[in-house]
A protein has these predicted regions:
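Residue-level signature of catalytic and energy-coupling elements of molecular machines
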Residues: 3, 19, 42, 55, ...
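A general structural signal for stabilizing positions within well-ordered secondary structure
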Residues: 13-16, 129, 146, 155
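Membrane-embedded transport module
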Residues: 71-121, 125, 135, 140-186
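Short glycine-rich hinge loops at helix-strand junctions in the catalytic core
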Residues: 46, 68, 116
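Proline-centered turn/helix-capping motifs that create local helix->coil transitions or kinks
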Residues: 11, 68-72
């Protein structure tokens, strides 16, 4: 982020006069501890991870690469997606989606379901609510918005994404127990 002195008039148009930089601020948001291991766990089990964000797709792609998400270099600016067919092709082709609106998140979840994918979605903001409602499995972070927690099927109380492998293992254990019990009655 650069702060500068500018004598011209500021508006939506590009700057027309010389700007003199007076400060440079570097911002960084490090990858959370355990993220690489968590994504590796899912990759080894054939789980396809998609990253859907309202941020710049180039930035999101770089962060996804750093986190070890497979095919993170395949990104798209969601503002370029216009038709239902665009979304269907995009979920087949891309891993990272940037500049995504809340309604587009929902459309992307629906497009993945149209591909016969079982869709699990994590989210913590009001902007995630529509997509969380449509996902086959919705997971919210307790530290996020009340709205996301209310619509989610599962809330991570410690808001730690690295707990996801243990959540999946617990879910599989429950399903296996139900299947074993059901087979006794058949």
């Amino acid at each position: 982020l650069v702060f500068a002195e500018y004598d011209g008039k500021l508006g939506k148009a590009p700057l027309t006069q010389k700007a003199v930089p007076i400060a440079l601020i570097m911002l960084a948001n490090p990858i959370r501890k355990g993220a690489k291991e968590t994504f590796s766990y899912f990759a080894k089990r054939g789980v396809e991870v998609k990253v859907i964000s309202g941020d710049n797709p180039v930035t999101v792609s770089a962060i996804a690469k750093e986190a070890g998400i497979a095919h993170a270099e395949r990104y798209v600016d969601a503002s370029t997606l216009k038709t239902k067919d665009d979304y269907q092709k995009a979920v087949q082709r891309y891993t990272v989606f940037g500049r995504v609106t809340p309604s587009q998140k929902r459309i992307l979840v629906q497009a993945l379901k149209n591909e016969r994918k079982t869709v699990a979605m994590t989210g913590d903001g009001v902007n995630d609510v529509l997509a969380l409602k449509d996902a086959d499995c919705s997971i919210a972070m307790a530290s996020g918005s009340d709205a996301a927690s209310q619509v989610a099927q599962l809330v991570l109380l410690d808001s730690d994404f690295s707990r996801m492998p243990s959540v999946v293992m617990e879910g599989r254990r429950v399903v296996n127990n139900i299947e074993r019990t059901a087979s006794l009655y058949i």
